[in-house]
């Protein structure tokens, strides 16, 4: 006699459930969770415990291609098939054209690509399926598509998330509080000679770190600097030390890009004659120390394209490689628009979409809600 056992989602071993959930695109998890309460509970446990992104060779993120938001899963496998990518445009946002992406605590800040100003920005929790449109009370002070922004939260128990931005019309800076659902001006000043770089901020442990440029006009020198904005004190710290020579003549000025390593460390890339990457060993709003991760002489790489401008990047400490997106305006797709550099001299390229990626952010899902808290009374 043969006995047939029907296995349903609710009776699958949790080891297998974990494996399945780790492979499901973040934008599909919401509909999947609704089919089984056990899976919903386990997916949330995975998020809180970090299992959903625990695969050290797998990276989850969002990328802008043609001003459209796409989810991207990147697997660094090693060997001949070193990289495996999966890029999918998110149909729910087909009507939105986006120019910048910022990630903080599982939330995604999306800046509109409307020229010249938009009166709203959008914040999403892709895992919870929540979206919040944030308006500005003054149309003339709308959101510039390539303005300076930062995303973070304060040290309060419930993590009040905040958005920082530079005002281009009236000057100065302002901040939005999710808790109060309001904007306010900030009493901070960087001086006339220091500028926040476009696409220049990343969020780490609630604070934002900016790539900034200080111009010394009389000496005809430019200076790269690193600056922290503390969302608890709502103020800038002092310039933080950088691990490379950060003062050069204007015509020799290099490219500096910031990234986060597993939301634990800050990484800085600097491209001039060589491409160097350093990772923080200790970081606070007013103090940082570094260790070198990678140095590459681009001119010695056989077949490396002339048109290369380092953009957003991903560091894989386990496999000792870095993935760098090419932001050059004219790219030969035969060379690829993303590059992998290894500490052992390894180099290869691959394509992400048919056009150069405009922005990228790694993503760590969370249960942070975008619902506005209602006060009693």
From Swiss-Prot:
InterPro entries: A_thaliana_F-box, F-box-assoc_dom_typ1, F-box-assoc_interact_dom, F-box-like_dom_sf, F-box_dom
One Pfam match: F-box
Spans through the membrane: none
Domain F-box as annotated: residue spans: 6-52
Domain of life: Eukaryota
Signal peptide start-end: none
PANTHER family: F-BOX ASSOCIATED UBIQUITINATION EFFECTOR FAMILY PROTEIN, OS09G0372900 PROTEIN-RELATED
This protein's name: Putative F-box protein At3g13830
Taxonomic lineage from the root: Eukaryota, Viridiplantae, Streptophyta, Embryophyta, Tracheophyta
């Amino acid at each position: 006699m043969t006995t047939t056992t029907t296995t349903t989602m609710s009776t699958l071993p949790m080891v297998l459930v974990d494996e399945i959930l780790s492979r499901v695109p973040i934008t599909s998890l919401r509909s999947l969770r609704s089919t089984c309460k056990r899976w919903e509970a386990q997916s949330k446990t995975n998020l809180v415990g970090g299992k959903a992104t625990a695969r050290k060779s797998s990276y989850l993120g969002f990328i802008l291609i043609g001003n459209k938001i796409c989810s991207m899963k990147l697997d660094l496998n090693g060997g001949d098939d070193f990289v495996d990518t999966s890029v999918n445009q998110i149909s729910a946002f087909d009507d939105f054209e986006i120019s910048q992406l910022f990630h903080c605590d599982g939330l995604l800040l999306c800046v509109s690509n409307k020229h010249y100003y938009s009166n709203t920005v959008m914040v999403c929790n892709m895992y919870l399926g929540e979206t919040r449109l944030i308006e500005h009370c003054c149309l003339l002070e709308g959101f510039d598509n390539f303005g300076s922004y930062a995303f973070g939260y304060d040290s309060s128990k419930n993590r009040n998330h905040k958005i920082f931005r530079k005002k281009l019309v009236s000057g100065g800076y302002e901040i939005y509080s999710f808790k109060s659902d309001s904007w306010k001006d900030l009493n901070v000043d960087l001086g006339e000679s220091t500028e926040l770089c476009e696409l220049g901020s990343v969020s780490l442990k609630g604070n934002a770190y900016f790539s900034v440029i200080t111009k010394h006009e009389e000496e005809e020198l430019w200076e790269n600097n690193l600056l922290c904005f503390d969302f608890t004190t709502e103020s800038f710290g002092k310039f933080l030390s950088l691990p490379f020579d950060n003062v050069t003549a204007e015509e020799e000025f290099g490219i500096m890009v910031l990234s986060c390593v597993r939301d634990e460390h800050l990484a800085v890339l600097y491209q001039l004659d060589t491409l160097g990457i350093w990772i923080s060993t200790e970081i606070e709003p007013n103090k940082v120390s570094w260790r070198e991760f990678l140095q590459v002489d681009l001119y010695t790489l056989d077949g490396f394209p002339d048109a290369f401008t380092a953009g957003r990047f991903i560091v894989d400490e386990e496999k000792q490689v870095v993935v760098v997106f090419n932001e050059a305006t004219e790219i030969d797709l035969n060379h690829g628009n993303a590059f992998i550099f290894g500490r052992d001299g390894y180099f290869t390229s691959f394509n992400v979409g048919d056009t150069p990626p405009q922005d990228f952010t790694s993503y760590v899902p969370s249960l942070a809600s975008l619902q506005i808290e209602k006060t009693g009374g």
